[in-house]
Amino acid sequence: MSVTKKPDLNDPVLRAKLAKGFGHNTYGEPAWPNDLLYIFPVVIFGTFACCIGLAVLDPAAMGEPANPFATPLEILPEWYFYPVFQILRTVPNKLLGVLAMAAVPVGLLTVPFIESINKFQNPYRRPIATILFLVGTLVAVWLGIGATFPIDISLTLGLF
């Protein structure tokens, strides 16, 4: 039979620390040294074991050799560049395309200043940041999917 350590929630010192939201993990134990000395090495070792195991058991396959004289009809970037590629492809002016790409990180930098009056860390209590995250994710997915289609149906994804 295992013994589980449960925090004494009647302790006023522990209640004060938990009310502030720092210094203890979910079980009420101190974060130092328990998390840094016991949990983190296990996570790091597990991550290395997974990476090495995948590299040994499933090595990357080599593709066909490159032919510099036969280029594909449409060159696409890697999948994580699809939204940026779609912005550059659909905006008619190159300067406007670059400004539209620069507006994304500038907009993300303004979120902490908008939400600075809100002291909650719970995402349900930070509606502006949560809505911006959800809208930004949907727009990025929409642009990423649209980048795989030809230019004439890329914005509407062929829906209308």
From Swiss-Prot:
In terms of PROSITE patterns, this protein maps to: CYTB_CTER
Compartments (UniProt record): Plastid, Chloroplast thylakoid membrane
Annotated membrane topology is: Multi-pass membrane protein
Under InterPro entries, the record lists: Cyt_b/b6_C (IPR005798), Cyt_b/b6_C_sf (IPR036150), Cyt_b6/f_cplx_suIV (IPR005870), Cytochrome_b_C_euk/bac (IPR048260)
Keywords for the protein's UniProt record, in alphabetical order: Chloroplast, Electron transport, Membrane, Photosynthesis, Plastid, Thylakoid, Transmembrane, Transmembrane helix, Transport
Q: Which GO terms describe its biological process?
A: photosynthetic electron transport chain
One Pfam entry for this protein is Cytochrom_B_C
**At the top level of its lineage, which domain of life is listed?**
Eukaryota
A Gene Ontology molecular function term of the record? oxidoreductase activity
Q: Is Iron tagged as a keyword? A: no
Give Gene Ontology CC terms.
chloroplast thylakoid membrane
NCBIfam families according to UniProt = cytb6_f_IV (TIGR01156)
Function of the molecule? Component of the cytochrome b6-f complex, which mediates electron transfer between photosystem II (PSII) and photosystem I (PSI), cyclic electron flow around PSI, and state transitions.
Q: Spell out the family assignment given in the record's similarity comment.
A: Belongs to the cytochrome b family. PetD subfamily.
PANTHER family in alphabetical order: CYTOCHROME B
UniProt subunit comment? The 4 large subunits of the cytochrome b6-f complex are cytochrome b6, subunit IV (17 kDa polypeptide, petD), cytochrome f and the Rieske protein, while the 4 small subunits are petG, petL, petM and petN. The complex functions as a dimer.
Protein name in UniProt: Cytochrome b6-f complex subunit 4
Q: Which species is this record about? A: Chlamydomonas moewusii (Chlamydomonas eugametos)
